[in-house]
Amino acid sequence: MNIDKALVLRTCANNMADHCGLIWPASGTVESKYWQSTRRHENGLVGLLWGAGTSAFLSVHADARWKVCEVAVADIIGLEEPGMVKFPRAEVVHVGDRISASHFISARQADPASTPTPTPTPMATPTPAAANIALPVVEQPSHEVFDVALVSAAAPSVNTLPVTTPQNLQTATYGSTLSGDNNSRLIAGYGSNETAGNHSDLIAGYGSTGTAGSDSSLVAGYGSTQTAGGDSALTAGYGSTQTAREGSNLTAGYGSTGTAGSDSSLIAGYGSTQTSGEDSSLTAGYGSTQTAQEGSNLTAGYGSTGTAGSDSSLIAGYGSTQTSGGDSSLTAGYGSTQTAQEGSNLTSGYGSTGTAGADSSLIAGYGSTQTSGSDSALTAGYGSTQTAQEGSNLTAGYGSTGTAGSDSSLIAGYGSTQTSGSDSSLTAGYGSTQTAQEGSNLTAGYGSTGTAGVDSSLIAGYGSTQTSGSDSALTAGYGSTQTAQEGSNLTAGYGSTGTAGADSSLIAGYGSTQTSGSESSLTAGYGSTQTAREGSTLTAGYGSTGTAGADSSLIAGYGSTQTSGSDSSLTAGYGSTQTAQQGSVLTSGYGSTQTAGAASNLTTGYGSTGTAGHESFIIAGYGSTQTAGHKSILTAGYGSTQTARDGSDLVAGYGSTGTAGSGSSLIAGYGSTQTASYKSMLTAGYGSTQTAREHSDLVAGYGSTSTAGSNSSLIAGYGSTQTAGFKSIMTAGYGSTQTAQERSDLVAGYGSTSTAGYSSSLIAGYGSTQTAGYGSTLTTGYGSTQTAQENSSLTTGYGSTSTAGYSSSLIAGYGSTQTAGYESTLTAGYGSTQTAQERSDLVTGYGSTSTAGYASSLIAGYGSTQTAGYESTLTAGYGSTQTAQENSSLTTGYGSTSTAGFASSLIAGYGSTQTAGYKSTLTAGYGSTQTAEYGSSLTAGYGSTATAGQDSSLIAGYGSTLTSGIRSFLTAGYGSTLIAGLRSVLIAGYGSSLTSGIRSTLTAGYGSNQIASYGSSLIAGHESIQVAGNKSMLIAGKGSSQTAGFRSTLIAGAGSVQLAGDRSRLIAGADSNQTAGDRSKLLAGNNSYLTAGDRSKLTGGHDCTLMAGDQSRLTAGKNSILTAGARSKLIGSEGSTLSAGEDSTLIFRLWDGKRYRQLVARTGENGVEADIPYYVNEDDDIVDKPDEDDDWIEVE
């Protein structure tokens, strides 16, 4: 070795990298790229001069690579640490382990020739080593002192390497205690204690304590305590405490505490505390605390706390707290708290709190709070709160609150609050509140409030409030309020209020109010009010008020008021008032007033007043007043007054007054007043008043009023009024009025009025009025009025008015008015008016008016007016007016007006007007007017006007006017006018006028006028006029006139006039006139006139006139006149005249009988004079035209 060289010792990782990342070579030169001549460690290479000095900068890892470098003495700078030097470059001369490197340096120190005597540099502080002199030792080192001499003394001589290996290696400073078994290596600072088994490697700073089993590796900073079983690896910073059983791997920062079972892996930042069972893996940031049983995997950010049972997996952000039982998986963002029993899976965003029982799954956004029992699944958006018992499933949007018992399912939108017992299912829109006991099912729209007892089902629209006891079912529209006790069923329209006792059923239209006791059933139309005690049944039309005691039954038409005690049955028409004590039965027509004692039965017509004691039976016509004692039976016609004691039977004609004791029989003539008891027989002349109970036989003369009980037989003369009970048979003369209960048979003369109960058969003469119950058959003469309930069959003469219930069949003569219920069949004569509910079939004569409900079929004569509901089929004669909802099919005669809804099909005769909804198909005769929404198909005759929405297809006859939306297809006959939106296709006959949007295709016959936006394609017949926007393509027949924007293409026949903008292409036949802008191309036949701007190309036949701007090219046949600007090229044949601006070329093509030859002249400097007309004379010379001939050109 050269005496100007010194040896330096240093260590690297097993990949030859130092702590700065520099990769050292196995041999050869290494140099610092950022060298600075300072006494600092950075910006240079450092090491121990001759391998002696502080060990603070030597690697303690067992796999470290020890390198010996040869450094020039002149490059060495001494550092403050004992033995440490800095140098800019070095040559690596040896790489091995600690022992081989020590041997290498010791051998070189023993060689006098290789020992340098370096001259100190100005900045160097250490004393240079002399030959064969030991390196100086620091008296009070702050770190362990490393000396290659000590290492070499403990190892065999270099000449015997590697024959023998040391049994153990121990290096320590004063005050340390080292104890190692075979093949152990122990290194410790002063005041340390190290104890190791076989094949162990312990390295610790001063004041540390290390205890390891066999085959272990312990590395710790000063003041640390490490205890490890066999096959363990512990690494800790200063002041740390690590305890591990066999096969564990612990890594911790300074001040940490780690305790691990066998085969565990712990990694923690400084100040952390980790405790784990066997087969566990813990990773934590600084200041964290982790505790896990065997087989667990914990990962947490700094400042976190994690506690896990066996076989669990915990992942958390910084500052989080996680606690789980065995077989659990927890994942949380920073600042979260999660607590779970065994087998649970929790995932939450930052700042969340999750608490779960065994086998549960929790997922939550940031800032959420979740608490669940075992076997539960909770999912929530950010800022939500969920609490559930075992076996529950909760899903909520952000900011929601959910509380559920066991085995429940909750789904809610954002900002909702849900609380349920076990086995419940709750679904709510955003901002809703739901509270349910166990076994309930709640569904609500947004902003709703639902409260349910056990085993209940609630469904509500948005903004509703529902409260129910157990075993209840509530259904409500939006904005409704429902309150029910257990076992109730409530259904209400929007804005309704329902309150029900236990086991009740409530049904109401919108805006209704219902209150019922237990076991009640209430049904009401919209805007009604019903109040009932337990066990009652109430049915009312819209706007009614019903109040019932227990076990009562109330039925009322719209606008009625009913009040009853318990066990009562009340039936009333619209606008009636009924008051009854317990056990009563009341029946009245519309506008009636009834008051009954207990157990009474009252039946009255409309506008009547009935007062009865208990267990009485009263029947009266409209406008009557009846007062009966106990168990009395009163029957009176309309407008009568009857007073009877109990058990009496009274029968009186109309306008009569009857008062009878019990069990009496009364018979009276017309205008009479009779009062009789039950089972009485009353006979009265006409104009009499009779009142009788059921099973009575009444006979009355003309103008009589008869009122009979059930199953009575009544016979009356002209102008009589009869009122009969159930299953009665009534016969009356002309102008009679008959009233009967259900299943009665009524026969009346002309001008009669008949009122019958259920399933009655009524026959009346001309001008009669009949009213029948359900399933009745009515027959009347001319001008009659019939009213029947559902399933009735009505037959009337001319000018009659018929009103029927559901599924009725009506037949009427001319000028009749018919009104029928659902699924009715109506037939009427000329000039009739028919009104039917949905799915009705109407047939009318000429000039009729028909109005039908949903899915009806209407047929009408000439001049009729028909109005139909949805999906109707209408057929009308000439001049009719039809109005239908969507999906209707309309057929009308000439001059009709049809208006149809969505997707309708309309067919009309000549001169008709049709208006249809979306996607309609319209067909009309000549001169018709059609209007349809987009997507429609219209077909019209000659001279028609059609207006359609976009995507429509229109076909019209001659002289028609069509207007359509975009993307339409229009076809028209001769002389038509078509207007369409952009992207339309128009086809028209001769002489038509077409106007379209951009990018349209127009096709027209001869002499047509077309106007289109730019980019359109136009095709027209001869002598047409076309006007198009820019970039259009125009094709026309001979004699046509075409006008287009720039960059357009125009094609026309002979005798045409073409005008186009710049960069256009014009093609025309002979005798045409073409005008275009700059950079255009023009082509025309003989005797044509062509004009274009600069840089254009013009080509014409014989006898043509061509004029163009600068830099143009003109070509023409014989006897033509060509004029162009500067820098142009002109080509003409025999007899042509050419004139051009400066720097142009004039070419004359001449035929000599065998071939063509050319005469060329150039204008400008060195050429002929510019802007002078030239021609070829008889001598084949190019000469200019004389001035006197300048005006020879004849321009058309």
Swiss-Prot record:
Subcellular localization, as worded in the UniProt entry: Cell outer membrane
Signal peptide: none
Residue segments, region Disordered: 269-304, 319-352, 415-442
Alphabetical UniProt keywords: Cell outer membrane, Ice nucleation, Membrane, Repeat
Gene Ontology CC: cell outer membrane
Membrane topology recorded in Swiss-Prot or TrEMBL: Peripheral membrane protein
GO molecular function per UniProt: ice binding
Region of interest (Octapeptide periodicity), ranges: 172-1147
InterPro entries, A to Z: Ice_nucleatn
Superkingdom assignment: Bacteria
Biased composition (Polar residues): 271-298, 319-346
Domain notes per entry: Contains many imperfect repeats of a consensus octapeptide A-G-Y-G-S-T-L-T; further on a 16-residue and a regional 48-residue periodicity is superimposed.
Function, in words: Ice nucleation proteins enable bacteria to nucleate crystallization in supercooled water.
PANTHER family, per database record: KERATIN-ASSOCIATED PROTEIN 21-1-RELATED, PTHR31294
Family: Belongs to the bacterial ice nucleation protein family.
Quaternary structure and partners: Membrane environment or aggregation seems to be required for ice nucleation activity.
Protein name: Ice nucleation protein
Taxonomic lineage from the root: Bacteria, Pseudomonadati, Pseudomonadota, Gammaproteobacteria, Pseudomonadales
